[in-house]
Regions:
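Register position in tetratricopeptide repeats
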Residues: 42, 76-77, 110-111, 127, ...
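Structural marker of alpha-solenoid helical repeat scaffolds
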Residues: 25, 59, 92-94, 127-129, ...
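TPR alpha-solenoid repeat register
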Residues: 66, 100, 134-136, 170, ...
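Terminal, low-structured helical/coil segments at or just beyond the last alpha-helical repeat
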Residues: 16-24, 193-248
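Canonical tetratricopeptide repeat
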Residues: 35, 69-72, 103, 137-139, ...
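Bacterial Sec signal peptide processing site at the extreme N-terminus
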Residues: 6-29
């Protein structure tokens, strides 16, 4: 199963999302500190990221952008309770900060809390001005797969594809869903679209090709996909699962 995607922090522009009004100079200093912290987060330098965030928090102790960035640092360093606390502080300060909500939902997903993550992703998708909305629909679909809700997952992936027709993960998962529903023609169509945007197929992409070939009795395609999966990804869970299935 695919992992959900985290919304990337902007590199240099910070929208003020804090508590008390401040002077332009203080706001500029705050934005500079947050931007530096984000750069350090991007390269995995957690100590310098925290140092700059602490300095930013001295300027504005109730800034949602700072809370969110702290949350990502703590999540990356395995301090999950602190990460959750910081995510919740960010959303309490600015409930409309959809990037933070998306990243909190991704955090919940990574902790196996799929029902909670689904609710947060669903809220994110309601923000029609959020640039990461296609990704939020994708993540919502992945949540629903984990919750054994294929119809809901398909609805979410369809919305994601309506906004981004080249979303390889949504195309792939729609192929699996259509195959499981017995619609091999649609499964082949989605797999073909996936191959167009991802010529170097993932193990899961090759597995879908295998399963479609198996379902349609296409022995040539079956042999080709099995050979590719064995040669390219011999240690992958997909190849092991396929070989175990063949030995039954």
């Amino acid at each position: 199963m695919c992992a959900v995607l985290i919304a990337q922090l902007p590199g240099c522009v910070t929208e003020y999302s804090g508590g008390s009004p401040m002077s332009a100079d203080l706001e500029a200093t705050l934005n500079k500190r947050v931007a530096l912290a984000r750069q350090y987060i991007g390269v995995g330098d957690w100590e310098n990221a925290k140092r700059n965030l602490e300095l930013a928090q001295e300027i504005d102790p109730e800034n949602a952008e700072v809370f969110e960035a702290f949350a990502l640092v703590y999540q990356s360093t395995g301090e999950f309770e602190m990460a959750e606390s910081q995510f919740r502080a960010a959303l309490k300060t600015d409930p409309a900060l959809s990037r933070a909500r998306n990243n909190f939902a991704a955090f919940l997903y990574s902790r196996g809390r799929f029902s909670e993550a689904e609710g947060e992703f669903s809220t994110v998708t309601e923000d029609t001005l959020y640039s990461g909305r296609p990704m939020a629909f994708l993540n919502l679909g992945l949540c629903r797969l984990q919750l054994d809700n294929p119809a809901g997952a398909e609805a979410a992936f369809t919305r994601a594809l309506s906004m981004d027709q080249r979303n390889s993960v949504a195309l792939l998962e729609m192929g699996f869903l259509r195959l499981e529903a017995g619609d091999t023609d649609e499964a082949k169509r989605y797999h073909g679209a996936y191959r167009t945007v991802s010529p170097q197929q993932s193990p899961r992409g090759l597995l879908l090709g295998l399963q479609i070939a198996d379902a349609t009795g296409d022995q040539d395609a079956l042999g080709s996909y099995e050979l590719a999966l064995r040669n390219l990804y011999p240690e992958s869970p997909e190849y092991r699962d396929w070989m175990e299935r063949q030995s039954r």
